[in-house]
A protein has these predicted regions:
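N-terminal export/targeting leaders of redox proteins
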Residues: 1-11, 111-114
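Solvent-exposed loop/turn segments at secondary-structure junctions
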Residues: 28, 43-46, 99
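Hydrophobic aliphatic residues
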Residues: 41-44, 73, 110
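Axial heme c-ligation environment in periplasmic c-type cytochrome domains
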Residues: 33-35, 49-102
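Protein kinase-like catalytic domain
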Residues: 23-26, 73, 114
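Thiol-/selenol-based redox modules, centered on thioredoxin-like
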Residues: 102-112
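Short microdomains enriched in Cys/His and/or Lys/Arg
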Residues: 40-52
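Sequence/structural segment immediately N-terminal to covalent heme-attachment motifs in c-type
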Residues: 7-32, 37-38
Length: 114
């Protein structure tokens, strides 16, 4: 019911605040230190105008899917296992989403923002 919806919205907001220091998630808005991640699902990695990306990320051909985003938002070790060691050059200062339920919630949220 309503309590579950409000609880989920609060949990998403709490978890997303960690991202919001650098990223926006609003249609048509300019990003912050990091790109706006509205519509990130299905988009190519390292291609948002106005941001500097590593050569690796720009030329990777990575498309942001549930699987690739989960790897990217995980800890550094998981990110490097999935994408390769070159990904260590990313400017994104991120320690990763630790809890499985938080990861699912954030991915569900990002998937709807398009």
């Amino acid at each position: 019911g309503l309590v579950a919806i409000v609880g989920t919205a609060y949990a998403i907001d709490k978890e997303f605040r960690k991202c919001a220091g650098c990223h926006k998630i609003e249609e048509g808005k300019k990003g912050g230190m990091g790109p706006n991640i509205w519509g990130v699902f299905g988009s190519p990695a390292g291609q948002v105008e106005g941001y500097r990306y590593s050569e690796y990320l720009k030329n990777s051909g990575i498309i942001w899917t549930r699987e690739s985003l989960q790897a990217w938002l995980s800890d550094r070790k998981t990110r490097q296992e999935y994408f390769g060691k070159e990904v260590k050059d990313t400017k994104m200062m991120w320690t990763g989403i630790k809890k499985e339920e938080d990861m699912k919630m954030i991915l569900d949220y990002l998937e709807k923002m398009k």
